């Protein structure tokens, strides 16, 4: 039996503390969209440059790579579980770098997903390359794929066009890395910016849709989902980050904080029904089974 670590009062944000390999098989529910930020397998004792300091890039044991075969099997296992949790017209977004994204694309194809786009996130403020022996790493990739090759997926074309000054949105997104204001409650070592998740959610979901994140971290996906008027389930194995997710969600119950976030996220200005309160008038059915 699944017992949520935290569920918001209006039930639009749920965190389950556990390993997604154990949690996902335990319930029957279909999601409209999945966002996944799986391990990049790049914690190898290297160094980087952040906020004017040289820092170790090791994120934790969960990010240490194994053999190519073990990484491929890891990706096959979680992507298979996620496919079972998607509606037939649902889509999945997966972020990565060259360390893992090619393995993921290979597995997606073998499992029957249809890859729609590979988004290049071009960071407007990347850290410098301190070795000066190759180009600065300034991009990450996000694969967008749908579950079924022949079932039409959801894409909010006109909204994306409006956000892009009336022109078709391209597959290169120039967005900053995470800002200090996004770490007000604490931080996760691989935390994604709200601007990135907001655009992903607005592109491929509708109001009140359900979004799953099997590697939730500090639940940036969930915060962005709620700011966009969507509902969220996150699965996170580290208790410290499940706790951080709870604090972050409770923070946006404060009207002034929510309004500040909305004002900072440019894409939200184009949302027809902007949810400036976290308290809906009614619950919208199709709730999680726990």
Model regions and ranges:
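Core catalytic lobe of class I
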Residues: 1-244, 284-290
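Short, conserved SAM-binding/catalytic segment
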Residues: 1-10, 246-262
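Short, flexible coil/linker elements and helix-boundary hinge sites characteristic
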Residues: 28, 112, 250, 256, ...
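Short alpha-helix boundary/capping motifs
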Residues: 110, 136, 228-229, 252-254, ...
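Short, flexible loop/turn segments with low-complexity composition
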Residues: 157-160, 256-266
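Amphipathic alpha-helical surface "interface" segments used
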Residues: 163-167, 266-272
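Acidic, low-complexity intrinsically disordered tails
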Residues: 271-290
